[in-house]
């Protein structure tokens, strides 16, 4: 499954913890057995635990690339926006990146979601496999090109 995670915003809603320099998705606020993890670490972990073969690409601004690599490692796919232009241009650029750089075909399903949702593990355990089956059924029947959840 091809997944685009949107992580381009400045994320000031957790002010004073977050600001233009330190976006909310990188603040380690979720307690784990090993310490704390950030929103981006949590959603990435949840996706890869449920679907180890998921191809995850993070759409982000150039100011956040080092934070993403610092928290997720250098092997995660990153599509860098030259400047922040809001959600639709970020999705358009990321899908062009999937097509041109990663070789994703125009008929392959792509899931787009933000990096800052709060999803319990039990929701991930059933949601991602259902979404995978659902997208494959659309892909096999060619019913639609996109969906929003």
Language-model features: locations:
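Conserved N-terminal catalytic core of the sugar/cofactor nucleotidyltransferase
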Residues: 2-5, 15-20, 28-114, 118-120, ...
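Conserved core of the sugar-phosphate nucleotidyltransferase
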Residues: 121-149
């Amino acid at each position: 499954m091809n997944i685009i995670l949107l992580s381009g915003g400045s994320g000031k809603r957790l002010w004073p913890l977050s600001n233009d320099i330190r976006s909310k998705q990188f603040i380690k606020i979720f307690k784990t057995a090993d310490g704390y993890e950030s929103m981006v670490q949590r959603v990435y972990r949840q996706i890869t635990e449920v679907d180890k073969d998921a191809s995850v690409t993070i759409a982000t601004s150039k100011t956040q690339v080092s934070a993403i690599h610092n928290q997720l490692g250098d092997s995660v796919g990153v599509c860098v926006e030259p400047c922040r232009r809001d959600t639709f241009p970020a999705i358009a650029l990321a899908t062009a990146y999937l097509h041109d750089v990663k070789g994703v075909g125009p008929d392959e399903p792509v899931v787009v979601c933000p990096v800052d949702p709060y999803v319990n593990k039990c929701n991930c355990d059933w949601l991602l496999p259902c979404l995978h089956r659902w997208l494959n059924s659309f892909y096999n029947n060619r019913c639609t090109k996109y969906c929003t959840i």
